[in-house]
């Protein structure tokens, strides 16, 4: 899962949106660094990552990537899952529009930015103003996201080429997401993540 799905699952679980979004920018044990509710959000994010990576359907999704891109497929899939969530938001979350959800999330996160790492503050400077989470619904934007990640981290250069697997296997990947994500939603609602 990437930013949007982590925020959505956090909201369903009544977990800290800030903690869930911040988690990738926090190394090691966050205890003592942040208030307990943010620590709980960071820990939920980590559990979601482990759970997602071990799902049989996600393991199946990785098989759609050739050997050249298999190493980066977990990252590519995390971004793709956000694409499918944004694309199917109205179906999956009929009681709240995506713009309304994002406005709420932003209001929960931005007031706390001064107390977060500089890299996280930098991300937030673009995430909201450029409407990244809404634009995840646009497949060309996903290609841009993967290219940008590849440009910033040379060790992940294969991310740019991994978009080919998305184009080639879009429908089966979408079907896998629409099968496993509603289950994760229920688990979040029942605080089983």
UniProtKB/Swiss-Prot annotation:
Q: Which reaction does it catalyse?
A: holo-[ACP] + H2O = apo-[ACP] + (R)-4'-phosphopantetheine + H(+)
Q: Which GO terms describe its molecular function?
A: [acyl-carrier-protein] phosphodiesterase activity
Keyword Lipid metabolism assigned:
yes
Q: Which domain of life is it from?
A: Bacteria
Q: Which family does it belong to?
A: Belongs to the AcpH family.
Described by its record, this protein's role is as follows: Converts holo-ACP to apo-ACP by hydrolytic cleavage of the phosphopantetheine prosthetic group from ACP.
Protein name from the UniProt record? Acyl carrier protein phosphodiesterase
* Organism for this UniProt entry: Yersinia pestis
